Amino acid sequence: MKILTQLIIAMLLINSTMAQTKKIIFVCDHGAGKSVVAASYFNKLAKERNLDYVAECRGTNPDSIVSLKTQEGLTKDDVYDAKIKPTKLQLSDTTNAERIILFTAAPQGINTKVKTENWSDIENVDAEYQKRRDAIIQKINSLLDTLEKH
């Protein structure tokens, strides 16, 4: 009976470890536009696919608030989370990240072994919100396809 109990405990521990939510970090200059759009849509689409991932947005030089165009666009899209505040990327953010997506150059001092992708080809979302949002969503869907296979 003792061995069976230990086996059950071991299986529960393995399952809880396997079920831990994995983190994706989206980084843009101000943490107020592209990274917010990306994290918002990543979380929505990952949830729809029942994937155990969560995204956070960060900035290398964060603004004090999410850009008004981003707030407006995400509100119209019904995915805006008013609790999001631009936050500076810290080394500790990258520690347990599964992947880091950069819309800007990686800041000095952030050296990580985490897989990093460069999405800097997407321009400012304030200029043409829908066009930029759609480009971000397309990249997110490709990323989710990749993550789904692992």
Which stretches of residues belong to each language-model region?
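Hydrophobic h-region of N-terminal signal peptides that target proteins for export
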Residues: 10-18
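A short, aliphatic-rich alpha-helical micro-motif
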Residues: 94-95
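Phosphate-binding/catalytic loops
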Residues: 108-150
